[in-house]
Each structure stands twice: as structure tokens, then as C-alpha cells.
Amino acid sequence: MGHRDVATVGLGGPVGSGKTAMVKRLVPRLDAAGYNVGVIANDIMTQEDADRLRESFEGILPPDLVEGVETGACPHTGIREDPSMNIAAIDEFTESYPDLDVVLLESGGDNLAATFNPELADYFIFVISVAEGDDIPRKRGPGVTQADLLVVNKTDLAPHVDADLEVMRRDAETVRGDAPTCFTDCKAEEGIDGVVDHIEEGVLFA
């Protein structure tokens, strides 16, 4: 586990890959499964993602369990080189909510090199979009190769962008070995339960 025995799950990935949409789908499912959840949304200069998430989770999470962190620099700075602001936000959560089970940490949009400091995230999910091209998995990058779970999101767009999901599946297996990959469509809520299963197996039941 991590900070004061609360599990921390980091979600990283390029701009537009669907990280915020994924958080919106994960929180109600984790809540329904009986977990007490907090959310931290990182961005460079704004609180927009945090504000949208807070509105989305009305009636599910108390407003003060959704926090925005403005990194003021490259997105990976706040999750890797200097995670102190995120760690402080987690500590504030656990002081107010000692029964908190898990905190989801959404990174600002970055590139394929984005990873989380292990002092910050117990479990790392890297989200890519089909719209970025079906060659993304084989381009590797630390996010793709080092994540505990790779999520290939926006599968509904595959026929519109000439992306081959089987190619992406094959390439993900080649570059990640036995590490898991999930294919999701957040809009249709497809594949989200599989992501929850991996979170439970990877960190909540660990």
C-alpha cells in the first residue's frame, strides 16, 4: 500500500487519450464495490478537470475528495520528478478521511515517456487512444512498457481512423510480455469492469 495505508493508482497518457473519461467511469464502480475513493487531477495551469470531475461525482464523492493540482510545469514533473504537491494532497485526504481506500491520480496530458514516481503511485495505468494510430504500442516508450496496466481506449474510433485493434493487441503483447492490456470504450462503458478488476487484483487486494 502507500500513504497511510491508502492505495494510490496513477493514470497517465497523452492529451486526449481519455484519462478523465476513464476516471469518470472508474469512480462509480469502485464506490459501488464498497471502496472509499479520492481523486486528484493534475494540470499545468487550470482546475478544469478537477471541476468537471467534482460535478460528475456529485452525490457519489464529497466535493473535498476531488482535488486539483496545478503543476505549473511539464505534466510529468508533478507525478515523477517532484510529486510533493500530490503527496501533500493525499495526506490531506487521509487526515480528513482516515477510512479512505484508494486515491486515483490523473496526470496532465503528456507523451509516451510519462511514468509515475513509485513513491506516489502504487499502481500505474497508462492510457492511449486508438485515434493516435495503431502503431503506438510498438513505438514503446516507458509509459507503454512500464505501466502495470496498458489501456487502449476509444476502440469505437478504430474503423474511422483505419486502426487495427488486433495489430495493437499483438504489438502490446510483444512489447509488454505478460503485463496486462485492456481495450476500452469509455463512451459506451465497454471494458471498464476489466480495468476495475486489474486495480483490485493489482493493489486493493495486494
Swiss-Prot record:
Short name of one Pfam family: cobW
Cellular location(s): Cytoplasm
Family listed: Belongs to the SIMIBI class G3E GTPase family. UreG subfamily.
Recorded superkingdom: Archaea
One BP term from GO: urea catabolic process
Binding site residues for GTP: G13, P14, V15, G16, S17, G18, K19, T20
Gene Ontology CC: one annotated term: cytoplasm
Cited InterPro entries: CobW/HypB/UreG_nucleotide-bd (IPR003495), P-loop_NTPase (IPR027417), UreG (IPR004400)
Role played: Facilitates the functional incorporation of the urease nickel metallocenter. This process requires GTP hydrolysis, probably effectuated by UreG.
Name of the protein in question: Urease accessory protein UreG
Organism, scientific name: Natronomonas pharaonis (strain ATCC 35678 / DSM 2160 / CIP 103997 / JCM 8858 / NBRC 14720 / NCIMB 2260 / Gabara) (Halobacterium pharaonis)
Gene3D superfamilies, per the entry: P-loop containing nucleotide triphosphate hydrolases
GO molecular function ontology, one term from the record: GTP binding
Subunit structure: Homodimer. UreD, UreF and UreG form a complex that acts as a GTP-hydrolysis-dependent molecular chaperone, activating the urease apoprotein by helping to assemble the nickel containing metallocenter of UreC. The UreE protein probably delivers the nickel.
Major location category of this protein: cytoplasm
Keyword vocabulary terms for this entry: Chaperone, Cytoplasm, GTP-binding, Nickel insertion, Nucleotide-binding
